[in-house]
Design a protein with these regions (language model features):
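Basic, low-complexity intrinsically disordered segments
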Residues: 1-137
Length: 137
């Protein structure tokens, strides 16, 4: 049986993302999307083995090791992001991770795809996307 140290894998993903951001800001969005997808996947797998409480444990360790950016809420969003992306045919590189976070509360893929389309076409900022969603609902 192969044991994976999920915590070290998650920590390495996040450290590598920090390095990538410093080296080349151009690829930041793609790096963020890839990193947060991978972290979400690892969190889901770790949760299967160790229970859902692992997110809280990892958030405490990551906060101590890497800073306050990785609280339980943030890690839960990464896990939800992974679950959302799994359902999608393609991921738009035109949207930032923050755009996708605005769409996480929705389960209707038609609604999500609609907001992705208008965000791409109208080049909406995260704030503009949020306002558009609030106007419709």
């Amino acid at each position: 049986m192969i044991f994976i140290n999920y915590y070290d894998e998650i920590k390495n993903e996040l450290i590598n993302n920090k390095i990538t951001k410093k080296i080349k800001d151009y690829s930041k969005n793609k790096s963020d999307l890839t990193t947060y997808y991978n972290v979400g996947k690892l969190l889901k797998e770790a949760g299967k083995h160790y229970g859902e409480g692992i997110i809280k444990e990892y958030s405490e360790k990551l906060t101590a090791d890497l800073g306050t950016k990785y609280d339980a809420s943030t890690l839960n969003k990464m896990k939800k992001f992974y679950n959302l992306i799994k359902k999608m045919a393609t991921v738009s590189p035109k949207l930032s991770y923050s755009h996708y976070v605005e769409l996480l509360p929705y389960s209707d893929m038609d609604k999500i795809n609609y907001y992705i389309k208008i965000t791409e076409e109208d080049k909406l900022s995260v704030r503009e996307l949020r306002e558009k969603i609030m106007k419709i609902y």
